[in-house]
């Protein structure tokens, strides 16, 4: 259903309706700044927190989408210091790459890393090394750390010039270096207290969390959703326009948040990462509004419950899928990864992909296996629906 923007959105520039994959409405900040301004850009839209704690161990993660395919050099969207003499910023290097630019050094997030679709960036520092991650993949390791902080700003660089034209969401600042597995595990879901470093206490490692939800934006204040109250003041606000924007994040049922992965526009036609045996691929790059997020119930072995006629056994592992828009994908399930078993693999047609809408009730068959490679079964051309999936077999020896 449509929502009234005047009823739902506070009246300042840059708050955009972001349809979440669960059909709720959250928001994303659009720093739609003038990409031609190179000096005296003090009228640009930005958010700021006063900060007085230097950190040599930290993690900064952020979902970002560029408003242009090749922003000019120094067009920034995050920084931690009030001049270029110290601290660092996340910006464009002017050659199509997101960059970590610091007083002690700089590093890139990979060639062609700037796109006009959503990408996840993360920076970690452990006191001696700085690492960069792009969509969960380690892309840079350097033997230096920038440890000087006197502010946290979003929407511009340290010099307050060359503001950026970027959408940003899910900004998280920690005073510890998270592992790659932690970054990957949480990039497609909002934070909750099941995170090892977060219990909603001021003693937690999480120091700033800008979720961009309806409850976190009010007037010219962007509220910190950590326990610390590090709210950002928003400056140079203007008129609001209604534009939809989509970040591949979902709130899956808590019992199905093991190994949460996604397939979205930045995945192009590459396989998604595997959620304990299940991967997805698409034949053509998804548009921004179309994506799927999926996790599983962390259960191995097999089951004979809730089966439709014509099947004898299914995986006890159940994958929950949440999706936005329309996604048609090949779903590939690795039997040994899914069940922990090493069965006699049958013909592709012996396998069925089952689906149900809720957490209980009988499954229905939605696809028959199209090919087998080792113990990987491919179900091709699946119209992905929200709900719960398992792999089943017509012969109990095949799982």
Residue spans for each PLM region:
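Extracellular/lumenal carbohydrate-interaction signature centered on repeated Trp-anchored short motifs
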Residues: 49-60, 111-119, 146-148, 160-167, ...
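Short, solvent-exposed beta-strand-to-loop segments that form ligand-recognition rims
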Residues: 134-152, 197
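Short, aromatic/His-centered strand-loop micro-motif at the edge of beta-sheets
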Residues: 98-120
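Short hydrophobic/aromatic patches on beta-strands that form ligand-binding or substrate-lining surfaces
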Residues: 58-68, 121-123, 154, 168-174, ...
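Extracellular glycan-interaction patches encoded by glycine-rich segments
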Residues: 36, 103-109, 148-169, 173, ...
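Localized edge beta-strand/strand-to-loop motifs within extracellular or lumenal beta-rich domains
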Residues: 117-131, 175
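Extracellular glycan-recognition modules
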Residues: 37, 41-99, 129-130, 162, ...
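Extracytoplasmic low-complexity segments
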Residues: 1-43, 187-320, 327-343, 347-350, ...
